[in-house]
């Protein structure tokens, strides 16, 4: 998709407008909201590992559902969410040293 086409789609997209209204960093947040409403995977978790975490929309949802949860987020792109419970690593998940985490995760996104 060309940049111009993508921008035009973004302007018309219902979920883009809804995300801005709710303060979400991305429209993808609503996908995780639907998953959580159906399966309740976030509220039971303590530690989350999130791949492809940029810009931070899913992390926002995770923290809304469970404010005490700890999130380890990985992405090669910039992460826009600043929160004390989110530990962001700007790295490729294929090259990341997982041994340094020293914890088990309840949920992987």
List the predicted regions and their residue ranges.
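Active-site catalytic pocket residues across diverse enzymes, especially alpha/beta-hydrolases
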Residues: 39, 66, 97
């Amino acid at each position: 998709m060309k940049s111009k086409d993508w921008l035009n789609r973004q302007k018309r997209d219902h979920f883009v407008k809804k995300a801005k209204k709710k303060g979400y960093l991305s429209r993808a947040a609503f996908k995780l909201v639907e998953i959580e409403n159906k399966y309740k995977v976030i509220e039971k978790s303590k530690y989350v590992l999130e791949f492809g975490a940029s810009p931070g929309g899913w992390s926002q949802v995770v923290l809304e559902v469970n404010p005490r949860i700890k999130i380890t987020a990985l992405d090669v792109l910039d992460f826009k969410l600043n929160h004390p419970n989110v530990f962001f690593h700007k790295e490729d998940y294929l090259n990341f040293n997982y041994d340094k985490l020293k914890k088990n995760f309840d949920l992987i996104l």
